[in-house]
Amino acid sequence: EHRANLAAVCAEEMTVNIIKFGGKTSNWIDINLCLEDDICQLRIRDNGVNFNPLEYSYDHEEFDIHGIELVKKISKSMDYIRAIDMNNTIISF
């Protein structure tokens, strides 16, 4: 249940970011949640502008943790690849 809650928070944060900053009027987002052995993976794919969340940093003093920084903090790992003009992010818990 704990990992499901983490996955829900991460899915919401990443999806909101894609919708706000995807740079297109017709974005699409594909979200999959996979559980294999003891690893829970949230896989997010979108056709927005090229954006690597691993390279993102938010340095604003008003917030301790902000959006993608929150996802990085609560996940076990995060991977990204740009393939076939799509952003592919895999977040593990």
Spell out what each predicted region is.
Residues 31, 42, 89-91:
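Hydrophobic residues positioned within well-ordered beta-strands of beta-sheet architectures
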Residues 28-38:
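Short beta-strand/loop element within the Bergerat-fold HATPase_c
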Residues 32-34, 43-45, 81:
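Solvent-exposed beta-strand sheet faces enriched in polar/charged residues
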Residues 26-28, 75:
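Short beta-strand-initiation
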Residues 2-26:
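Conserved ATP-binding N-box helix of the HATPase_c
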Residues 17-21, 39, 50:
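Amphipathic alpha-helical interaction surfaces
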Residues 72-93:
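Flexible, glycine-/charge-rich segments associated with ATP-binding catalytic modules
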Residues 40-68:
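Glycine-rich/acidic phosphate-handling loop/turn and adjacent ATP-lid/helix
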